[in-house]
UniProtKB/Swiss-Prot annotation:
Active site (record annotation): D314 (proton acceptor)
Domain of life: Bacteria
An annotated GO cellular component: cytoplasm
Species this protein is from: Hamiltonella defensa subsp. Acyrthosiphon pisum (strain 5AT)
Record keywords, A-Z: Amino-acid biosynthesis, Aromatic amino acid biosynthesis, Cytoplasm, Transferase
Catalytic activity: 3-phosphoshikimate + phosphoenolpyruvate = 5-O-(1-carboxyvinyl)-3-phosphoshikimate + phosphate
Location in the cell: Cytoplasm
Name the record gives this protein: 3-phosphoshikimate 1-carboxyvinyltransferase
GO molecular-function term, one example from the UniProt record: 3-phosphoshikimate 1-carboxyvinyltransferase activity
Amino acid sequence: MSKSLNLEPIGKINGTVYLPGSKSISNRVLLLSALAAGKTRLTNFLDSDDTRYMLEALKALGVRYTVSKNGTCCEVEGVNGPLNTPHPIELMTGNAGTVMRFLTAVLSLGQSDVVLTGGARMKERPMDPLVDALRQGNAQITYLEKKNSPPLRLRGGFRGGNLTLRGNISSQFLTALLIMAPLAEQDTAIEVQGFLVSKPYVEMTLHLMRVFGISVTHKHYRTFNIKAHQKFKSPGHYRIEGDATAASYFLAAAAIKGGCVRVIGVGQKSIQGDVQFADVLQKMGAFIHWGEDYIECRPGRLKGIDMDMNSMPDAAMTLATTALFSEGPTRIQNIYNWRLKETDRLSAMSAELRKLGAQIKEGQDYIEIISPKNLKAAEIQTYNDHRIAMSFSLMALSDMPIRILNPRCTSKTFPDFFQKLAYLSGTV
Protein backbone atom coordinates (compact mmCIF):
# COMPACT_ATOMS: atom_id res chain seq x y z
CA MET A 1 0.00 0.00 0.00
CA SER A 2 1.29 3.49 -0.86
CA LYS A 3 2.15 6.24 1.62
CA SER A 4 -1.31 7.76 1.22
CA LEU A 5 -4.77 6.68 0.10
CA ASN A 6 -7.24 8.93 -1.70
CA LEU A 7 -10.85 8.04 -0.91
CA GLU A 8 -13.33 9.43 -3.41
CA PRO A 9 -16.83 10.40 -2.24
CA ILE A 10 -18.99 7.35 -1.56
CA GLY A 11 -22.58 7.59 -2.77
CA LYS A 12 -24.06 4.75 -0.75
CA ILE A 13 -23.06 1.96 1.61
CA ASN A 14 -24.84 -1.37 1.36
CA GLY A 15 -24.11 -5.06 1.92
CA THR A 16 -22.77 -7.67 4.30
CA VAL A 17 -19.38 -7.76 6.03
CA TYR A 18 -17.83 -10.84 7.60
CA LEU A 19 -15.75 -9.41 10.41
CA PRO A 20 -12.16 -10.43 11.09
CA GLY A 21 -11.53 -12.10 14.42
CA SER A 22 -11.34 -9.89 17.47
CA LYS A 23 -7.81 -8.71 18.27
CA SER A 24 -8.55 -8.51 21.98
CA ILE A 25 -9.87 -12.07 22.07
CA SER A 26 -7.20 -13.46 19.71
CA ASN A 27 -4.27 -12.36 21.85
CA ARG A 28 -5.96 -13.46 25.06
CA VAL A 29 -6.76 -16.96 23.82
CA LEU A 30 -3.31 -17.31 22.25
CA LEU A 31 -1.74 -16.79 25.66
CA LEU A 32 -4.30 -18.92 27.51
CA SER A 33 -3.75 -21.72 24.99
CA ALA A 34 0.01 -21.50 25.52
CA LEU A 35 -0.39 -21.83 29.30
CA ALA A 36 -2.89 -24.69 29.06
CA ALA A 37 -2.57 -28.44 29.01
CA GLY A 38 -3.30 -29.87 25.57
CA LYS A 39 -3.70 -28.57 22.05
CA THR A 40 -6.13 -25.75 21.25
CA ARG A 41 -7.51 -25.03 17.79
CA LEU A 42 -8.42 -21.36 17.35
CA THR A 43 -10.65 -20.52 14.39
CA ASN A 44 -11.59 -17.12 12.96
CA PHE A 45 -8.17 -16.12 14.25
CA LEU A 46 -7.00 -12.59 13.44
CA ASP A 47 -3.88 -12.41 11.29
CA SER A 48 -2.50 -8.94 12.05
CA ASP A 49 0.58 -7.15 13.35
CA ASP A 50 -0.50 -7.43 17.00
CA THR A 51 -1.20 -11.16 16.88
CA ARG A 52 2.05 -11.80 15.02
CA TYR A 53 4.01 -10.13 17.82
CA MET A 54 2.31 -12.42 20.31
CA LEU A 55 3.01 -15.48 18.18
CA GLU A 56 6.68 -14.58 17.71
CA ALA A 57 7.10 -14.05 21.45
CA LEU A 58 5.46 -17.38 22.26
CA LYS A 59 7.68 -19.12 19.72
CA ALA A 60 10.79 -17.66 21.35
CA LEU A 61 9.51 -18.96 24.69
CA GLY A 62 9.24 -22.51 23.36
CA VAL A 63 5.55 -22.66 22.50
CA ARG A 64 4.74 -24.69 19.40
CA TYR A 65 1.96 -23.66 17.04
CA THR A 66 0.86 -23.82 13.43
CA VAL A 67 -1.07 -21.22 11.44
CA SER A 68 -3.13 -22.05 8.35
CA LYS A 69 -2.14 -20.60 4.98
CA ASN A 70 -4.98 -18.09 5.05
CA GLY A 71 -4.07 -17.06 8.60
CA THR A 72 -7.51 -17.67 10.11
CA CYS A 73 -6.79 -20.91 12.01
CA CYS A 74 -4.09 -21.36 14.64
CA GLU A 75 -3.31 -24.54 16.59
CA VAL A 76 -1.34 -24.08 19.81
CA GLU A 77 0.33 -26.79 21.88
CA GLY A 78 0.16 -25.67 25.49
CA VAL A 79 3.07 -26.04 27.91
CA ASN A 80 0.80 -26.78 30.90
CA GLY A 81 2.20 -24.09 33.15
CA PRO A 82 4.30 -20.92 33.22
CA LEU A 83 6.39 -19.86 30.24
CA ASN A 84 10.11 -20.21 30.85
CA THR A 85 13.31 -19.97 28.87
CA PRO A 86 16.68 -21.46 29.92
CA HIS A 87 18.64 -18.59 28.37
CA PRO A 88 18.32 -14.80 28.59
CA ILE A 89 16.31 -13.47 25.65
CA GLU A 90 14.87 -10.20 24.35
CA LEU A 91 11.34 -10.06 22.97
CA MET A 92 9.98 -7.35 20.67
CA THR A 93 6.33 -6.42 21.20
CA GLY A 94 6.05 -3.64 18.60
CA ASN A 95 3.26 -1.30 19.62
CA ALA A 96 1.00 -4.09 20.89
CA GLY A 97 -0.09 -3.17 24.40
CA THR A 98 -1.69 -6.57 24.96
CA VAL A 99 1.59 -8.35 24.22
CA MET A 100 3.77 -6.07 26.35
CA ARG A 101 1.45 -6.01 29.34
CA PHE A 102 0.25 -9.62 29.35
CA LEU A 103 3.78 -11.00 28.97
CA THR A 104 5.18 -8.68 31.64
CA ALA A 105 2.90 -10.40 34.13
CA VAL A 106 3.20 -13.97 32.86
CA LEU A 107 7.00 -13.80 32.62
CA SER A 108 7.18 -12.57 36.21
CA LEU A 109 6.51 -16.17 37.21
CA GLY A 110 9.41 -18.60 37.38
CA GLN A 111 13.06 -17.61 37.07
CA SER A 112 13.58 -16.62 33.43
CA ASP A 113 15.69 -13.62 32.41
CA VAL A 114 13.75 -11.76 29.72
CA VAL A 115 13.89 -8.25 28.29
CA LEU A 116 10.63 -6.94 26.85
CA THR A 117 10.98 -4.03 24.46
CA GLY A 118 8.75 -2.31 21.93
CA GLY A 119 8.40 0.36 19.30
CA ALA A 120 8.93 4.07 19.86
CA ARG A 121 5.39 4.75 21.07
CA MET A 122 5.38 1.67 23.31
CA LYS A 123 8.44 3.08 25.08
CA GLU A 124 6.32 6.10 26.04
CA ARG A 125 3.30 4.18 27.32
CA PRO A 126 2.86 3.66 31.08
CA MET A 127 3.70 0.38 32.77
CA ASP A 128 4.05 1.47 36.39
CA PRO A 129 0.60 0.42 37.67
CA LEU A 130 1.32 -3.16 36.57
CA VAL A 131 4.98 -3.18 37.62
CA ASP A 132 4.12 -1.75 41.04
CA ALA A 133 1.50 -4.46 41.58
CA LEU A 134 3.83 -7.25 40.46
CA ARG A 135 6.60 -6.01 42.74
CA GLN A 136 4.18 -6.31 45.67
CA GLY A 137 4.18 -10.03 44.88
CA ASN A 138 8.03 -10.10 44.84
CA ALA A 139 8.50 -9.88 41.06
CA GLN A 140 11.98 -8.72 40.03
CA ILE A 141 11.46 -6.05 37.36
CA THR A 142 13.86 -3.33 36.18
CA TYR A 143 13.19 -0.34 33.92
CA LEU A 144 16.05 -0.26 31.41
CA GLU A 145 15.60 3.19 29.90
CA LYS A 146 12.88 5.54 31.13
CA LYS A 147 11.23 5.05 34.50
CA ASN A 148 7.67 3.67 34.32
CA SER A 149 7.91 2.65 30.63
CA PRO A 150 9.45 -0.16 28.54
CA PRO A 151 11.87 -1.72 27.94
CA LEU A 152 11.75 -3.92 31.03
CA ARG A 153 13.97 -6.68 32.38
CA LEU A 154 12.04 -9.49 34.05
CA ARG A 155 13.71 -12.02 36.36
CA GLY A 156 10.70 -13.88 37.70
CA GLY A 157 10.14 -14.08 41.44
CA PHE A 158 6.38 -13.45 41.63
CA ARG A 159 4.79 -15.53 44.38
CA GLY A 160 1.29 -14.09 44.90
CA GLY A 161 -0.22 -12.42 47.94
CA ASN A 162 -2.14 -9.20 48.41
CA LEU A 163 -1.82 -6.70 45.56
CA THR A 164 -3.20 -3.23 44.94
CA LEU A 165 -3.63 -1.95 41.38
CA ARG A 166 -4.53 1.49 40.09
CA GLY A 167 -7.49 0.97 37.78
CA ASN A 168 -7.68 4.32 36.01
CA ILE A 169 -5.05 3.86 33.28
CA SER A 170 -5.76 0.60 31.45
CA SER A 171 -7.78 -2.55 32.07
CA GLN A 172 -4.96 -4.50 30.39
CA PHE A 173 -3.02 -4.34 33.67
CA LEU A 174 -5.78 -6.12 35.56
CA THR A 175 -6.20 -8.66 32.76
CA ALA A 176 -2.46 -9.38 32.91
CA LEU A 177 -2.59 -10.07 36.65
CA LEU A 178 -5.71 -12.21 36.36
CA ILE A 179 -4.15 -14.42 33.68
CA MET A 180 -0.91 -15.08 35.56
CA ALA A 181 -2.22 -15.35 39.15
CA PRO A 182 -3.65 -18.91 38.88
CA LEU A 183 -0.10 -20.18 38.26
CA ALA A 184 1.43 -18.44 41.29
CA GLU A 185 2.80 -20.22 44.37
CA GLN A 186 0.38 -18.47 46.72
CA ASP A 187 -3.22 -17.32 46.46
CA THR A 188 -3.54 -13.82 45.04
CA ALA A 189 -5.92 -11.05 46.09
CA ILE A 190 -6.13 -7.95 43.89
CA GLU A 191 -7.68 -4.72 45.13
CA VAL A 192 -8.50 -2.21 42.38
CA GLN A 193 -7.95 1.35 43.55
CA GLY A 194 -9.88 4.18 41.93
CA PHE A 195 -12.09 3.95 38.88
CA LEU A 196 -11.72 0.82 36.72
CA VAL A 197 -11.56 1.86 33.06
CA SER A 198 -12.81 -0.31 30.20
CA LYS A 199 -14.54 -2.82 32.49
CA PRO A 200 -16.03 -4.85 29.60
CA TYR A 201 -12.51 -5.99 28.68
CA VAL A 202 -12.10 -7.42 32.19
CA GLU A 203 -15.44 -9.19 31.83
CA MET A 204 -14.14 -10.64 28.55
CA THR A 205 -10.98 -11.87 30.27
CA LEU A 206 -12.93 -13.58 33.07
CA HIS A 207 -15.21 -15.26 30.52
CA LEU A 208 -12.25 -16.62 28.55
CA MET A 209 -10.52 -17.83 31.71
CA ARG A 210 -13.65 -19.83 32.57
CA VAL A 211 -13.52 -21.37 29.09
CA PHE A 212 -9.99 -22.54 29.97
CA GLY A 213 -11.07 -23.96 33.34
CA ILE A 214 -9.94 -21.17 35.68
CA SER A 215 -12.01 -19.90 38.58
CA VAL A 216 -11.82 -16.28 39.77
CA THR A 217 -14.10 -14.69 42.35
CA HIS A 218 -14.65 -10.96 42.61
CA LYS A 219 -16.74 -8.44 44.49
CA HIS A 220 -18.22 -5.74 42.26
CA TYR A 221 -14.99 -5.62 40.21
CA ARG A 222 -13.22 -4.00 43.19
CA THR A 223 -11.53 -7.06 44.69
CA PHE A 224 -10.50 -10.26 42.93
CA ASN A 225 -9.44 -13.53 44.55
CA ILE A 226 -7.51 -16.16 42.60
CA LYS A 227 -6.51 -19.52 44.03
CA ALA A 228 -2.93 -20.65 43.42
CA HIS A 229 -1.79 -23.82 41.63
CA GLN A 230 -4.69 -23.89 39.18
CA LYS A 231 -4.28 -25.47 35.75
CA PHE A 232 -5.43 -24.00 32.46
CA LYS A 233 -7.24 -26.70 30.46
CA SER A 234 -7.64 -26.53 26.71
CA PRO A 235 -11.25 -26.46 25.47
CA GLY A 236 -9.96 -28.27 22.36
CA HIS A 237 -11.52 -25.77 19.96
CA TYR A 238 -12.44 -22.13 20.38
CA ARG A 239 -14.01 -19.96 17.70
CA ILE A 240 -13.06 -16.30 18.03
CA GLU A 241 -15.95 -13.93 17.45
CA GLY A 242 -15.67 -11.00 15.07
CA ASP A 243 -14.03 -7.75 16.11
CA ALA A 244 -16.69 -5.46 17.57
CA THR A 245 -14.60 -2.31 17.19
CA ALA A 246 -14.11 -3.15 13.51
CA ALA A 247 -17.88 -3.50 13.23
CA SER A 248 -18.34 0.06 14.47
CA TYR A 249 -16.94 1.61 11.27
CA PHE A 250 -19.34 -0.25 8.99
CA LEU A 251 -22.35 0.28 11.24
CA ALA A 252 -21.58 3.99 11.42
CA ALA A 253 -21.20 4.12 7.63
CA ALA A 254 -24.68 2.64 7.24
CA ALA A 255 -26.11 5.09 9.76
CA ILE A 256 -24.63 7.95 7.75
CA LYS A 257 -25.26 6.80 4.18
CA GLY A 258 -27.05 3.47 3.97
CA GLY A 259 -28.47 1.29 2.51
CA CYS A 260 -28.40 -1.43 4.99
CA VAL A 261 -25.23 -2.98 6.36
CA ARG A 262 -25.12 -6.30 8.18
CA VAL A 263 -21.95 -7.17 10.11
CA ILE A 264 -21.58 -10.89 10.77
CA GLY A 265 -19.52 -12.22 13.66
CA VAL A 266 -20.93 -10.24 16.58
CA GLY A 267 -24.44 -10.03 17.93
CA GLN A 268 -26.63 -10.57 20.97
CA LYS A 269 -24.25 -13.13 22.50
CA SER A 270 -21.04 -11.15 21.99
CA ILE A 271 -18.59 -10.96 24.90
CA GLN A 272 -17.17 -7.62 23.68
CA GLY A 273 -18.30 -4.34 25.16
CA ASP A 274 -17.91 -2.47 21.88
CA VAL A 275 -21.05 -4.10 20.46
CA GLN A 276 -22.86 -1.49 22.55
CA PHE A 277 -21.80 1.06 19.93
CA ALA A 278 -24.85 -0.10 18.00
CA ASP A 279 -26.98 1.23 20.87
CA VAL A 280 -25.16 4.57 20.63
CA LEU A 281 -26.05 4.79 16.93
CA GLN A 282 -29.65 3.96 17.76
CA LYS A 283 -29.76 6.78 20.30
CA MET A 284 -28.46 9.11 17.59
CA GLY A 285 -31.30 8.11 15.26
CA ALA A 286 -30.10 5.08 13.29
CA PHE A 287 -32.18 1.91 13.00
CA ILE A 288 -30.57 -1.19 14.52
CA HIS A 289 -31.58 -4.84 14.35
CA TRP A 290 -29.83 -7.50 16.43
CA GLY A 291 -29.37 -11.15 15.56
CA GLU A 292 -27.61 -13.88 17.48
CA ASP A 293 -24.39 -13.40 15.50
CA TYR A 294 -25.05 -10.27 13.46
CA ILE A 295 -26.05 -6.62 13.72
CA GLU A 296 -27.83 -4.63 11.01
CA CYS A 297 -27.91 -0.87 10.67
CA ARG A 298 -30.03 1.40 8.48
CA PRO A 299 -29.74 5.18 8.24
CA GLY A 300 -31.74 7.69 10.19
CA ARG A 301 -31.67 11.40 10.87
CA LEU A 302 -28.68 11.55 13.19
CA LYS A 303 -28.58 13.90 16.16
CA GLY A 304 -25.68 14.81 18.40
CA ILE A 305 -25.34 12.97 21.69
CA ASP A 306 -23.72 13.32 25.11
CA MET A 307 -22.11 10.00 26.06
CA ASP A 308 -19.78 8.56 28.68
CA MET A 309 -17.66 6.26 26.49
CA ASN A 310 -15.26 4.93 29.12
CA SER A 311 -16.50 1.37 28.62
CA MET A 312 -15.71 1.45 24.88
CA PRO A 313 -12.92 3.98 24.23
CA ASP A 314 -11.95 2.52 20.85
CA ALA A 315 -15.46 2.74 19.44
CA ALA A 316 -15.63 6.27 20.86
CA MET A 317 -13.31 7.32 18.05
CA THR A 318 -15.90 6.15 15.54
CA LEU A 319 -18.45 8.26 17.37
CA ALA A 320 -16.20 11.31 17.02
CA THR A 321 -16.19 11.15 13.22
CA THR A 322 -19.85 10.08 13.01
CA ALA A 323 -20.65 13.27 14.92
CA LEU A 324 -19.69 15.28 11.83
CA PHE A 325 -22.79 13.90 10.09
CA SER A 326 -25.22 14.67 12.92
CA GLU A 327 -27.31 17.68 13.89
CA GLY A 328 -26.24 19.47 17.04
CA PRO A 329 -23.19 19.06 19.27
CA THR A 330 -21.73 15.76 20.41
CA ARG A 331 -19.86 15.41 23.70
CA ILE A 332 -17.74 12.32 24.38
CA GLN A 333 -16.82 12.03 28.06
CA ASN A 334 -14.58 10.04 30.40
CA ILE A 335 -11.98 9.15 27.77
CA TYR A 336 -8.75 10.22 29.48
CA ASN A 337 -7.11 6.95 28.49
CA TRP A 338 -7.28 8.12 24.83
CA ARG A 339 -4.16 10.06 25.77
CA LEU A 340 -2.28 6.86 26.61
CA LYS A 341 -3.01 4.83 23.49
CA GLU A 342 -1.06 4.43 20.22
CA THR A 343 -0.86 8.23 20.24
CA ASP A 344 -2.44 10.98 22.34
CA ARG A 345 -5.77 10.37 20.68
CA LEU A 346 -7.54 13.33 22.25
CA SER A 347 -5.04 15.80 20.81
CA ALA A 348 -4.76 13.95 17.50
CA MET A 349 -8.51 13.62 16.93
CA SER A 350 -9.06 17.27 17.85
CA ALA A 351 -6.42 18.41 15.36
CA GLU A 352 -7.74 16.30 12.49
CA LEU A 353 -11.40 17.15 13.14
CA ARG A 354 -10.53 20.84 13.02
CA LYS A 355 -8.98 20.32 9.57
CA LEU A 356 -12.44 19.28 8.38
CA GLY A 357 -14.01 22.47 9.69
CA ALA A 358 -15.45 21.16 12.95
CA GLN A 359 -15.61 23.30 16.07
CA ILE A 360 -13.78 21.42 18.81
CA LYS A 361 -13.49 21.85 22.55
CA GLU A 362 -10.87 19.53 24.01
CA GLY A 363 -10.69 18.85 27.74
CA GLN A 364 -8.45 16.61 29.78
CA ASP A 365 -10.89 13.71 29.45
CA TYR A 366 -13.54 14.82 26.97
CA ILE A 367 -14.12 16.24 23.52
CA GLU A 368 -17.02 18.34 22.22
CA ILE A 369 -17.70 18.37 18.49
CA ILE A 370 -19.90 20.68 16.44
CA SER A 371 -20.15 19.80 12.77
CA PRO A 372 -19.68 22.57 10.19
CA LYS A 373 -22.35 23.31 7.60
CA ASN A 374 -19.92 22.16 4.92
CA LEU A 375 -17.08 19.77 5.56
CA LYS A 376 -13.71 20.65 4.08
CA ALA A 377 -11.52 18.34 2.03
CA ALA A 378 -8.46 17.43 4.06
CA GLU A 379 -5.35 15.32 4.34
CA ILE A 380 -5.59 13.22 7.49
CA GLN A 381 -2.46 12.53 9.50
CA THR A 382 -2.91 9.14 11.15
CA TYR A 383 -0.05 9.29 13.68
CA ASN A 384 0.62 5.62 12.91
CA ASP A 385 -2.66 4.89 14.71
CA HIS A 386 -4.91 2.31 13.05
CA ARG A 387 -8.07 3.60 14.69
CA ILE A 388 -7.54 7.15 13.45
CA ALA A 389 -7.14 5.86 9.89
CA MET A 390 -10.30 3.77 10.04
CA SER A 391 -12.40 6.39 11.84
CA PHE A 392 -11.58 9.13 9.35
CA SER A 393 -12.33 6.89 6.38
CA LEU A 394 -15.98 7.74 7.15
CA MET A 395 -15.31 11.21 5.76
CA ALA A 396 -15.55 9.69 2.28
CA LEU A 397 -19.29 9.48 2.96
CA SER A 398 -19.47 13.25 2.54
CA ASP A 399 -19.44 14.96 -0.84
CA MET A 400 -15.73 15.58 -0.84
CA PRO A 401 -12.66 13.34 -1.14
CA ILE A 402 -10.36 12.57 1.77
CA ARG A 403 -6.70 11.59 1.81
CA ILE A 404 -5.49 9.18 4.49
CA LEU A 405 -1.75 9.26 5.18
CA ASN A 406 0.01 6.00 6.09
CA PRO A 407 -3.06 3.82 5.51
CA ARG A 408 -0.99 0.70 6.14
CA CYS A 409 -1.18 1.38 9.88
CA THR A 410 -4.52 -0.49 9.82
CA SER A 411 -2.48 -3.72 9.58
CA LYS A 412 -2.16 -3.54 13.37
CA THR A 413 -5.66 -4.97 13.74
CA PHE A 414 -7.49 -4.96 10.37
CA PRO A 415 -5.18 -5.41 7.34
CA ASP A 416 -7.94 -5.51 4.69
CA PHE A 417 -10.15 -2.76 6.12
CA PHE A 418 -10.07 -0.52 3.05
CA GLN A 419 -10.90 -3.43 0.73
CA LYS A 420 -14.00 -4.24 2.79
CA LEU A 421 -15.03 -0.58 2.78
CA ALA A 422 -14.63 -0.45 -0.99
CA TYR A 423 -16.75 -3.61 -1.33
CA LEU A 424 -19.62 -2.05 0.63
CA SER A 425 -19.42 1.13 -1.42
CA GLY A 426 -19.61 -0.82 -4.69
CA THR A 427 -16.24 0.41 -5.95
CA VAL A 428 -14.76 -3.08 -6.36
